[in-house]
Amino acid sequence: PVSQDLTGSTISPNTSRRVMSNYETMEEGAKIYSLQSLLTPTPKPKDDPAFKDKEGKDPVEVVSIWLGRDYLNMILNLKVSTGKGHTFGIIEDKSELETTGSVDMLLYHDADSDEEYYNRRAYISVPLKQYAESEHPTDGIKIKFRYYTYGKEADVIEDYEFEYTPGKTE
């Protein structure tokens, strides 16, 4: 239980939110020093209205990326001026999920014309549990993740591959 929350934050009862926190475990419970909500975009197909009329190819730098507890987690560096208006999403292609057991994901980032002056961090946690088969819920799934990054050429794409096993905590 939380014994002391120094953040002044409120999360409504009976709600669920993915957060990053700095805390200390104490005998009477956790003492929370900082708390930040994470972006948790649910993967959607490229023809979803959320991606309409925008390319979403604005670059990011991946600081760290890892699988954990049915999520693909990442820390990103963005170059920003105001940092306002940035939109993130995950474009999925699961056309090979049934045949090869793989899902392709592309990070959608629309900076909304924000100029690139300063570095700012973004924390994203992509839910993956929806890819687990109901008949074989622990079968592994290959996640192919791509994103646009900074480079001399426009449209520089980097990629990662992960073997996701639903329910695995590591």
Where are these regions (language model features)?
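Extracytoplasmic beta-rich ectodomain segments of secreted or membrane-anchored proteins
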Residues: 42-75
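Surface-exposed, short loops/turns at beta-strand junctions within beta-sandwich domains
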Residues: 12-13, 131-138
